[in-house]
Amino acid sequence: MSSNLSIDERWKVIEAYFKSKGLVRQHLDSYNDFVRNKLQEIIDEQGEIPTEIPGLKVRLGKIRIGKPRVRESDRGEREISPMEARLRNLTYAAPLWLTMIPVENNIEAEPEEVYIGDLPIMLKSAIDPISQYTLDKLIEIGEDPKDPGGYFIVNGSERVIVTQEDLAPNRVLVDTGKTGSNITHTAKIISSTAGYRVPVTIERLKDGTFHVSFPAVPGKIPFVILMRALGILTDRDIVYAVSLDPEIQNELFPSLEQASSIANVDDALDFIGSRVAIGQKRENRIEKAQQIIDKYFLPHLGTSADDRRKKAYYLAYAISKVIELYLGRREPDDKDHYANKRLRLAGDLFASLFRVAFKAFVKDLTYQLEKSKVRGRKLALKALVRPDIVTERIRHALATGNWVGGRTGVSQLLDRTNWLSMLSHLRRVISSLARGQPNFEARDLHGTQWGRMCPFETPEGPNSGLVKNLALMAQIAVGINEKIVEKTLYEMGVVPVEEVIRRVTEGGEDQNEYLKWSKVILNGRLVGYYRDGEELAKKIRERRRKGEISDEVNVGHIVTDFINEVHVNCDSGRVRRPLIIVSNGNPLVTREDIEKLDSGSITFDDLVRQGKIEYLDAEEEENAYVALEPSDLTPEHTHLEIWSPAILGITASIIPYPEHNQSPRNTYQSAMAKQALGLYAANYQLRTDTRAHLLHYPQRPLVQTRALDIIGYTNRPAGNNAILAVISFTGYNMEDSIIMNRSSVERGMYRSTFFRLYSTEEVKYPGGQEDKIVMPEPGVRGYKGKEYYRLLEDNGVVSPEVEVKGGDVLIGKVSPPRFLQEFKELSPEQAKRDTSIVTRHGEMGIVDLVLITETAEGNKLVKVRVRDLRIPSIGDKFASRHGQKGVIGMLIPQVDMPYTVKGVVPDVILNPHALPSRMTLGQIMEGIAGKYAALSGNIVDATPFYKTPIEQLQNEILKYGYLPDATEVTYDGRTGQKIKSRIYFGVVYYQKLHHMVADKIHARARGPVQILTRQPTEGRAREGGLRFGEMERDCLIGFGTAMLLKDRLLDNSDRTTIYVCDQCGYIGWYDKNKNKYVCPIHGDKSNLFPVTVSYAFKLLIQELMSMIISPRLILEDRVGLSGGKGNE
């Protein structure tokens, strides 16, 4: 049997993978795990609600999640669909019901199911009803049938929880100390458990002593004292706990000497307690120290007194790692290695958020219970519970992105520019590192990111390398309970640490024998020793492939001259990727398997269960020897890549021939693909997005990669196939600008529509006042003038298909006054103010949709969508799929464009200078492939590494009568003369990006000014001016153009006239009664003269006065135009 699986056969495996997994599986899996397991665990952690009242407590039972629904203002409840939530600005959430059992004097009352709050639902997750709907049913409720879900709807807007990248918690990471400090080597452990994280630091000082520090105790605690406090007393026990190796044991002498005065547990605890409970009695100090050690020292190992020995052995293991580093037996741990990274997904983040919300809820309920019991009422739990505590906590965090633990930007608005940008946003990974610091290593592409993170897709600028995207096949472990794995390990013959130490110290066995044994480390914790590490790793893998151990478990065996460790991992957040298992140089996935996959009789998961494909994390991949191609296989290989191009992420996968481009060009294209206009959602006509673009005639690319079908790009494309000529023509395509065929544009090429939403609701205010959506009366404050309201109907709302321009009122609205005193003074009509919604300045369009509905509070909500036709014009931005971006420099009619012998006229003309220095060979190849596709009617495969060879395509176009280099004899359309050299003509996919001149064009003559400085406002949205800055001013000073300088900086900015007293130099004020200016000091006894200054200068003087500095303006005689006395 030939073991060489063809490209097509391996592609079937990929298709099966995505059929069963989809593209946003990682969020859905994580959220489902939260809903099914973590939610109940958080409730069980609390267990019961204790109260101050003797004999009364409330026991907590099972939690149940209802169907998504809304509570209407008339208190009725009904189920809602996601689309209704979007349109009515609701939150798509389901009620949580918790069983509570009041217990009085150990007598249980009837269990009650109590509503405790709302939980936002992730679309398409296990608890979302629409995940079970058929395609027709989805279309019926207004959803895009291909929408992947994975996001939330909060207050009508779609929000994503972005995956967070973190250093792996509960691992010992060793490093060398800073040069020049007293510390030579350090170990850091982020001990993370339900609800809180405690960093523990171990330091080796120059004198050879070891110190431990953690936040709850000020200062550093000597290592031996801490070990004694944890219950390991004798020097011998401490030394053997650290290591069985005499060389390592010797390094502990300085530490043992340092702590020789403290010999028992109580003294050690008192040493710690004297830092925490200063000046208290010895018993209190010891008790406090015990509490702190249990709760705040390595809490992930447990928080009871029974866990102290476990903590001692963990600490000893960390010390042994530091000593090994000091002795040169191991390298410092690589913080950027992906084995030391964990991703926190929606489920983990939601769990930490819900935990905090639930704690607040319990605290409030305890208070309410005590308050009601004191009054001696019968317990009515339903009346005492305040569900809005949980609801609001969670909703606020999702709506703002401010999470517990001080993280910001955790939830973001889903980017719906096009289909690709939405998918890419759902697969984004953010590193929590500060982007202000350089962090060069953290930004670099690390070898362990192969197949896990996309090598191209990262932003330019300060976030470069910190914001990443998952590769196509990356999958994130949900994690399983480590107790199960620990039990299995002991069954397989792993000897626990304590047992080994007992055998050596008391049983008299040879410690050198155990030094040859392998350390077994489970999730970063030393659990025991095993005779042969290689054998153990092999056994675990065999069991996993047989399905006896969960496939979430990964194992790596690390062997160097000094180190022999087996690392077993089963925690959540590890990025893993599937590989085909190879034995004796043959892949275990056979042709028969692939035929079964193709026919649908087995799924991808079945292959994993059968042990033919397995998921490896970065740690286990260190042991794997992976072949890229079946033809590379040798008997030494352990695994085979399923599909090499799957190392790319979603956006980089759509680039044709990416391996022929310079690397940064692919990065630029990955960013621009998210800005291209296309069909962003099939239900766009029902949606009310704040801003949306729609390309009228998107086409699927003629030159495709295989990933396009998986991503769904062929059904929701964003671009057109354009005929491209490469020629320096007219000079209007210099410096990356392009020339476009005006006739093609007039036929509809790259036309798009821009939708903008305007919305408002009738808000009710305290005191019985409310907004009204009506046509405002001419008497109200801020009335704009009759012509602005001309489009409104009787109900105060514009009607559909009406043309509007900047300043026109779309929704008329009046609001009560802001302050009460106005209300008393003015007539009822004047008291109201006009708060109408107007079309943005500088925009125009046609009213597309008017939606009148009401919010959950029962307030009237009006949404108006305005559409604007956008025809490509000079200055609009376009880009090919190879990072070649440019703006239109000129639109030339077809008659003036160059044409070939066959009469073909290009749609786009690109300057040849854009190609050599950028080295985007992919674009030249795409042009040839596109030409073949257009001639033959076949779509060309340009998948990286597995493409149709370009030479083959060149031979093909030769058969159609074209030159293999795709050049053609061309004539100048203006003169009809033949152009001397042959011109390259090809078909290239061009994208229209959302940077359009219509959104950016801006000029101003007169306009609004700022209240404070009376200078023109800034920015296009506020009709602002263009700033004449300091450097521009310097130029004018250099030119000596005094009048121009005065014109820009005074006359056309904030010129104002002030009146200055000729005696004291203060600015006077205008007395209305006397009808003249008076000096604040001399009254009307002095003369005041007008002086022209900048208002900003006047403001500066008055602000100085407020700081008790007294600037005075000294006046001299004004120079007459005919010349003064000669001494001015």
Swiss-Prot record:
- Binding sites annotated in the UniProt record for dsDNA: 178, 181-182, 206, 435-439, 1027-1032
Q: Output the GO biological process annotations, alphabetical, semicolon-separated.
A: DNA-templated transcription
Tell me what reaction this enzyme catalyses. Answer: RNA(n) + a ribonucleoside 5'-triphosphate = RNA(n+1) + diphosphate
Question: What does the cofactor field's note say?
Answer: Binds at least 1 Zn(2+) ion per subunit.
Q: Sum up the protein's function in the record's words.
A: DNA-dependent RNA polymerase (RNAP) catalyzes the transcription of DNA into RNA using the four ribonucleoside triphosphates as substrates. This subunit is involved in DNA promoter recognition.
Know the name of this protein? DNA-directed RNA polymerase subunit Rpo2
Alphabetical keyword list? Cytoplasm, DNA-binding, DNA-directed RNA polymerase, Metal-binding, Nucleotidyltransferase, Transcription, Transferase, Zinc
The record's comment on protein family reads: Belongs to the RNA polymerase beta chain family.
**Molecular function GO terms recorded:** DNA binding; DNA-directed RNA polymerase activity; ribonucleoside binding; zinc ion binding
Cofactor(s) recorded for this entry are: Zn(2+)
Under InterPro entries, the record lists: DNA-dir_RNA_pol_su2, DNA-dir_RNAP_su2_dom, DNA-dir_RNAP_su2_hyb_sf, RNA_pol_bsu_CS, RNA_pol_bsu_protrusion, RNA_pol_Rpb2_2, RNA_pol_Rpb2_2_sf, RNA_pol_Rpb2_3
Enzyme's top EC category: transferase
* Gene Ontology annotations for the cellular component aspect, listed alphabetically: cytoplasm; DNA-directed RNA polymerase complex
- Please verify whether the record's keywords include Mitochondrion: no
Instruction: Report the EC number(s), separated by commas if there are several.
Output: 2.7.7.6
Does the keyword section mention Oxidoreductase?
no
Q: Where in the cell is it found?
A: Cytoplasm
The record lists the organism as Saccharolobus shibatae (strain ATCC 51178 / DSM 5389 / JCM 8931 / NBRC 15437 / B12) (Sulfolobus shibatae)
Which annotated residues bind Zn(2+)? C1061, C1064, C1079, H1082
Q: How does it assemble?
A: Part of the 13-subunit RNA polymerase complex.
Main localization (coarse): cytoplasm
